[in-house]
Design a protein with these regions (language model features):
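Membrane interface segments of multi-pass transport proteins and intramembrane proteases
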Residues: 115-120, 154, 219-235, 333-342
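Generic multipass alpha-helical transmembrane bundles of integral membrane proteins
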Residues: 183-306
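Helical hairpin unit composed of two closely spaced alpha helices linked by a short loop
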Residues: 298-339
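Gly/Ser-rich, low-complexity
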Residues: 4, 8-104, 108-127, 141-156, ...
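Mid-bilayer segments of alpha-helical transmembrane spans in multi-pass integral membrane proteins
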Residues: 129-141, 160-177, 197-205, 209, ...
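Small-residue-enriched core segments of transmembrane alpha-helices in multipass membrane transport
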Residues: 125-135, 156-165, 193-199, 230-244, ...
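Interfacial loop-to-transmembrane junctions
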Residues: 336-356
């Protein structure tokens, strides 16, 4: 009888613990659903559909999936996507590379035949003909790549603008009012820097750099070499400075804002504990809601980061393939063709590298802005 009584006591205690755990799970799920209902996923999804027109991506569905299993890489498989993008970019550049390779061969053949004639007129005429045709093709392709890059960055800025109010609300609900304000202010500053500095100044400087580099190779006397070096230094300096300054400002402010939020949360919980009779219950519910809000905020941020990565992956791979193609063609042309043609191709490859660096700078700025906020109270 005594043994049966002990079994009933322990069995009842375990049942109560299980019921309490189930109740807490239900309360957490209810709190998550209530917080998710306050977020505007429709406007975000419209911008995601515009940004990822060739991919099917559900923003709200990904957030809910992360809330359940917490694995962001289950919905984002980058390996096959990168290979597919590289293959598509290579096929897109294949025609241009064939034409430029034919121009390189034509320049080499014409240069060999022109050496049989007296004087430099025939050789110079053949060189200028080939060089100007190659220059026209390079500038046309580079202009198209620059316009595509500008459209991608503009779409990324529009996505971050739509994302900001909902992410601000999620961060504020997580008990991080000061952190949410910091995020809002810093994101506006990052968007301003991207639009007014990177798009309005750095991108045109890259185009000017390539044009001057091509003209410099055309003259053959290096009369504009210092100008190209100056532009390259300015572009690289502006990209590095913008990244360092903006990220540094966020890191410094992130040392203060989370501490203020933590102090306010602690004061609120201590006040709730002092309420007679229901203090512990209120404190438990408050901690549950705060934990759910932090989880939603971080899942929301990770989903936004996945969208940014998916949106920037295709143009980044395209620019990388284009730059490598021009560099390889320049290396192949140097032994058989005029050094100015090889220099022209190498300058185009360097221009594509600058475009890629610009895109990566924008991506890193947005990703770190989200990651710094998501890292608080994690």
């Amino acid at each position: 009888m005594a043994l049966l009584f002990l079994c009933l006591i322990f069995g009842t205690g375990r049942t109560q613990k299980i019921e309490a755990a189930d109740t807490e799970t239900d309360q957490a799920a209810a709190a998550q659903d209530e917080l998710l209902a306050e977020l505007d996923f429709d406007a975000i999804q419209q911008e995601v559909d515009s940004l990822l027109s060739s991919q099917q991506f559900s923003f709200a569905g990904t957030v809910r999936s992360l809330l359940q299993d917490g694995d962001p890489f289950r919905t984002f498989r980058a390996g096959n996507a990168v290979l597919s993008c590289a293959k598509t970019a290579f096929l897109a550049q294949k025609g241009l590379m064939k034409e430029l390779f034919l121009f390189v061969l034509a320049g080499a053949v014409l240069g060999s035949f022109s050496s049989l004639f007296e004087g430099k007129q025939v050789r110079d005429a053949s060189f200028y003909m080939v060089y100007l045709l190659a220059l026209a093709l390079i500038l046309k392709n580079f202009q198209s790549s620059g316009e595509n890059l500008k459209a991608v960055i503009t779409s990324l800025v529009a996505f971050m603008r739509i994302l900001t109010p909902s992410y601000y609300l999620a961060a504020a609900a997580a008990g991080g009012a000061s952190s949410a304000v910091m995020f809002y202010q810093m994101l506006l500053l990052v968007i301003l820097a991207v639009e007014k500095l990177l798009l309005a100044l750095v991108l045109p400087m890259i185009h000017i750099y390539l044009l001057i580099a091509l003209v410099n190779d055309l003259s053959g006397e290096e009369i504009l070499s210092h100008m190209t070096e100056l532009l390259e230094t300015c572009v690289n300096g502006l990209l590095k400075s913008s990244l360092g300054v903006l990220v540094g400002m966020q890191m410094i402010r992130n040392l203060i804002a989370p501490a203020l939020d933590s102090l306010r949360q602690m004061a609120l919980w201590r006040t709730a504990e002092m309420i007679p009779g229901i203090g512990n219950a209120v404190n438990a519910v408050t901690e549950l809601v705060a934990g759910s809000a932090v989880l939603i905020r971080n899942c929301f941020g990770v989903t936004a980061m996945l969208v940014l990565l998916a949106a920037g992956m295709v143009p980044a791979v395209q620019l990388l393939v284009s730059g490598l193609s021009f560099r390889l063609l320049a290396a192949a042309a140097q032994p058989v063709s005029d050094k100015r043609i090889a220099g022209c191709l190498a300058a185009a490859g360097k221009g594509y590298a600058m475009l890629l660096r610009l895109l990566l700078t924008v991506e890193v700025l947005f990703l770190l802005t989200i990651a710094i906020l998501a890292g608080t109270f994690s």
